[in-house]
UniProtKB/Swiss-Prot annotation:
The gene is secA. This is Protein translocase subunit SecA. ATP binds at Q87, G105, E106, G107, K108, T109, D512. It is found in: Cell inner membrane; Cytoplasm. It comes from Tolumonas auensis (strain DSM 9187 / NBRC 110442 / TA 4). May bind 1 zinc ion per subunit. PROSITE patterns: SECA, SECA_MOTOR_DEAD. It comes from the Bacteria. GO terms for biological process: intracellular protein transmembrane transport; protein import; protein targeting; protein transport by the Sec complex. GO terms for molecular function: ATP binding; metal ion binding; protein-exporting ATPase activity. It catalyses: ATP + H2O + cellular proteinSide 1 = ADP + phosphate + cellular proteinSide 2. Keywords: ATP-binding, Cell inner membrane, Cell membrane, Cytoplasm, Membrane, Metal-binding, Nucleotide-binding, Protein transport, Translocase, Translocation, Transport, Zinc. Its EC number is 7.4.2.8. Its cofactor is Zn(2+).
């Protein structure tokens, strides 16, 4: 109460921020007459002027008023569109590394041009991030004329582009693209084998559209580049036949309750668990099928894989529904985004879940994958020097933006007052009663000539509602993942009088629903439209537009509350854009997912006290409050999950940064021979220490073991025992120096044979391949560690601290293995001696004075195989083409001279 009163007197933090923004906008507005008087050439010259001022040391932010005034004036001339003051405020917020909450229809696409232009002046590149390829392409094409007028280039980064197209897109001043594509390009760049293969420049400024969708909804989903692992499709099919034999046990309030079921389902945590009875039953079944030994336990280390398959099959059959969580198309299981209702082609669930669902649906089972590289959106976007975002609904997640990304949220006022009527929720006892009420509401709105947008939370629900409307004879359009291709066309005409559109969640987000329909879409559908046709279309649209405005605007119907209040607000936000009239209402039932899982007891109690009858709805602030509290609980739980994910991923992220930084240095270095020499000395020191301990008596030395190790790991046969026998004063340090000296000499000889440049390139190639192989294995080890780390809590240990400690140990081991394997491969390479016949042939064909043969492909193969070799095992050397010729042997040409005095001179 006191806080509210205090805020009312001095204003909230947001109010004070908006007040400060208005002062800067005033400065920009004062420049408008001056910039309006400039000729096109003079206005365009401003870009060059700004860049010169930056080069002379002027701060970027000091250019803001003039740069924004330039963009506003250019927009007036190119698009005949003038940035509103609230859009100017939005641009300032975005330049200040903050999140701008701008309501639907306030012109976020035009707003983005302001900070994009200003930050592109630095020449470091601006990335404008959208949620799908359609929006990226649309926004890039729309903004290109404006930026071209100002002398800037615009690129578009889409999936499926060639390497050259991507390089060209990233080389532009401003690049539009999707969050997925930017993230995957980053990972691919860090798997490149040459600096010129990379496409991205250093990450400077990212402006994220629909920032809540990208940084919050998708934060739990890591981007993963993977390769195929072992095939276990038959096992998935077999285990899937087990699940129908299992009986579900209903959870009871009493912890002592012991049911007879085989498994329980926790819908909140999206997990299924075997009961004690279930474990006994599953063990017996697996033994019957010959998948487990008679004396084996399901929980023994040897059977962890089987348990993993059983858990995946159980979750697939009890928690994941077709046309809700995924669709099956062309014998492929495609995930449906729970937040947008869009399909996510190419994405797969991990931990065998996707394969279990494929087995359940009888679809082709793809191999499990091994992670080659991964990163979460949380960590990818934190790599940018500057990060900002915009959305219509950020305030409910302001705390998370601040905590995770360090981004403040600024809620901007609308250009015109909001007049949408958000009516209270209506709650029914059953789903059938709810749908009956929705149909009646739709009939009323259609009769009033009002367009209706019905939001559902799944494809299944959208098709159920569509079937009911079809039976009732109500014409409508369905917009869900199955009709993704028609998305833009359906949304464009969703504002026509009496139009009824059913959409899953926020499908169609990013495209405004214009009251009366989109006249632009009608014109675009015509080939070479005449001026008369355009005038007719606009005239007819105006009549429809006025009719819809008069009847009350777009009516929004929510068929269920989403887990997040923000998603509900996004649905409501489709109506009432730019001061248009509109209304919204949510219809709920006690059988809805959210109500059943989180709010059922409290609301059910209220409804029973009120004596609800069939078909009767309850509309009361208490009910709305209870539902909102349920949503807050879910939001809090999801925030904890995301925060927990980040805390664990931060450990891997620190390691990722080190590896990628070292990898990039490798790519950009022409010569790493000094690094290799240091590594070689370090590795040899460690190896020698294992057999000749520092400051130890010679009786404890294992000379035979050292000779064997040097032979197998470094391909050098050194008679160390003979050295000691010949010189009894040869102490430890001298032995060490002599071993290293011999190996260095051997390596120098290889360099003579192979050539300096070739060996330098090969060293780099071996280092990169070995690093990539070990990093891949390290990621698998980290994933394995992560999956079981929570069990440390039972031993009264902090799982996060244990994870950090063990992850560091794994990382240290990986770095040591890297040194060991690189040195071993480089020491074991065999360079082919010259083939005399080939030399003679070459000499006859040309005047070339020198020929060397070097099998690069064979050496590459050795580098790849090294990761699989086991310590102590000898590796076959390269096979030489032809017999080796000693320098004192007779020359094969038949001259009778020694080889070294004849064709051997060519060496």
């Amino acid at each position: 109460m006191i806080t509210k009163l205090f805020t009312k007197i001095i204003g909230s933090r947001n109010d004070r921020t908006v007040k400060a923004l208005k002062k800067i906008v005033k400065q920009i507005n004062e420049l408008e007459p001056q910039f309006a008087s400039l000729a096109d050439v003079d206005l365009q010259a401003k870009t060059v002027e700004f860049r010169q001022r930056l080069e002379k040391g002027e701060e970027l932010d000091s250019l803001l008023p003039e740069a924004f005034a330039t963009v506003r004036e250019a927009s007036k001339r190119v698009f005949a569109m003038r940035h509103f003051d609230v859009q100017m405020m939005g641009g300032i917020v975005l330049n200040n590394n903050q999140i701008a909450e701008m309501k639907t229809g306030e012109g976020k696409t035009l707003t983005a041009t302001l900070p994009a232009y200003l930050n592109a002046l630095t020449g470091q590149g601006v990335h404008i991030v959208t949620v799908n390829d359609y929006l990226a392409r649309r926004d890039a094409e729309w903004s290109r004329p404006l930026f071209a007028f100002l002398g800037m280039t615009v690129g578009c980064n889409l999936s499926g582009m060639s390497h050259e197209e991507k390089q060209a897109a990233y080389a532009c001043d401003i690049t539009y693209g999707t969050n997925n594509e930017f993230g995957f390009d980053y990972l691919r760049d860090n798997m490149a084998f040459a600096a010129e293969q990379r496409v991205q420049r250093p990450l400077y400024y990212a402006l994220v559209d629909e920032v809540d969708s990208v940084l919050i909804d998708e934060a739990r989903t890591p981007l993963i580049i993977s390769g195929a692992a072992e095939d276990s499709s038959e096992l998935y099919i077999k285990i899937n036949t087990l699940v129908p034999l299992l009986q579900k046990q209903d959870k009871e309030d009493s912890e002592e309750y012991q049911g007879n079921g085989h498994y329980t389902v926790d819908e909140k945590a999206r997990q299924a668990y075997l009961t004690e009875n279930g474990q006994i039953f599953v063990e017996g079944w697996l033994k019957q099928q010959g998948l487990m030994g008679e004396d084996d336990s399901l929980f023994s280390v040897a059977n962890i894989t089987l348990l993993h398959h059983v858990n995946a099959a159980l979750r697939a059959n009890t928690l994941f529904e077709r046309d809700v969580d995924y669709i099956v198309k062309d014998d492929e299981v495609i995930i449906v985004d729970e937040h947008t209702g869009r399909t996510m082609a190419g994405r797969r669930w991990s931990e065998g879940l996707h394969q279990a669902i494929e087995a359940k649906e009888g679809a082709k089972i793809r191999n499990e994958n091994q992670t080659l590289a991964s990163i979460t959106f949380q960590n990818y976007f934190r790599l940018y020097e500057k990060l900002a975002g915009m959305t219509g609904t950020a305030d409910t997640e302001a705390y998370e933006f601040q905590q995770i990304y360090g981004l403040e949220t600024v809620v901007l006022p609308t250009n015109r007052p909001m007049i949408r009527d958000d009516m209270g929720d209506l709650v029914y006892l059953t789903e059938q009663e709810k749908y009956d009420a929705i149909i009646e509401d739709i009939k009323i709105r259609v009769a009033e000539q009002r367009p209706v947008l019905v939001g559902t939370i799944s494809i299944e629900n959208s098709e159920l509602l569509s079937n009911i409307l079809t039976k009732e004879g109500i014409e409508h359009k369905v917009l869900n993942a199955k009709f993704h291709a028609q998305e833009a066309q359906i949304v464009a005409q969703a504002g026509r009088p009496s139009a009824v559109t059913i959409a899953t969640n926020m499908a169609g987000r990013g495209t405004d629903i214009v009251l009366g329909g989109s006249w632009q879409a009608e014109i675009d559908a015509l080939e070479n439209p005449t001026a008369e046709q355009i005038a007719t279309i606009k005239s007819e649209w105006q009549v429809r537009h006025d009719a819809v405005i008069t009847s009350g605007g777009l009516h929004i119907i929510g068929t269920e509350r989403h887990e997040s209040r923000r998603i509900d607000n996004q649905l409501r936000g489709r109506s009432g854009r730019q001061g248009d009239p509109g209304s919204s209402r949510f219809y709920l039932s006690m059988e809805d997912s959210l109500m059943r899982i989180f709010a059922s007891d409290r609301v059910s109690g209220m409804m029973k006290k009120l004596g609800m009858e069939h078909g009767e709805a309850i509309e009361h602030p208490w009910v709305s409050k209870a539902i909102e509290n349920a949503q807050r609980k879910v939001e809090g739980r999801n925030f904890d999950i995301r925060k927990n994910l980040l805390e664990f991923d931060d450990v891997a992220n620190d390691q990722r940064k080190v590896v990628y930084e070292q990898r990039n240095e490798l790519l950009e270095s022409a010569d790493i021979s000094e690094t290799i020499k240091l590594i070689r000395t370090d590795v040899l020191d460690r190896v020698i220490d294992q057999y000749i301990a520092p400051h130890s008596l010679d009786e404890s030395w294992d000379i035979a073991g050292l000779e064997l190790r040097l032979r197998t790991d470094f391909a050098i046969d050194l008679p160390i025992a003979q050295w000691i026998k010949e010189d009894d004063k040869l102490y430890e340090e001298k032995i060490r120096e002599r071993i290293i000296s011999e190996i260095e000499a051997s390596y120098a000889h290889k360099e003579e044979l192979a050539g300096h440049d070739v060996l330098r390139q090969f060293e780099k190639s071996v280092m990169l391949q070995t690093l990539d192989n070990l990093w891949k294995e390290h990621l698998a080890a980290m994933d394995h560690l992560r999956q079981g780390i929570h069990l440390r809590g039972y031993a009264q240990k902090n799982p996060k601290q244990e994870y950090k400690r063990e992850a560091f140990e794994l990382f240290t081991q990986m770095l040591e293995a890297l040194k060991q394997q690189v040195v071993s491969v480089l020491c074991r390479i065999q360079v082919q001696e010259p083939d005399v016949d080939a030399i003679e042939e070459q000499r006859r064909q040309s005047d070339s004075a020198q020929v060397r043969t070097y099998s690069h492909e064979e050496i590459n193969a050795l580098a790849e195989d090294e990761a699989e070799s086991v310590d102590g095992q000898a590796v076959e050397p390269f096979v030489r083409d032809g017999a080796k010729i000693g320098r004192n042997d007779p020359c094969p040409c038949g001259s009778g001279k020694k080889y070294k005095h004849c064709h051997g001179k060519l060496d």
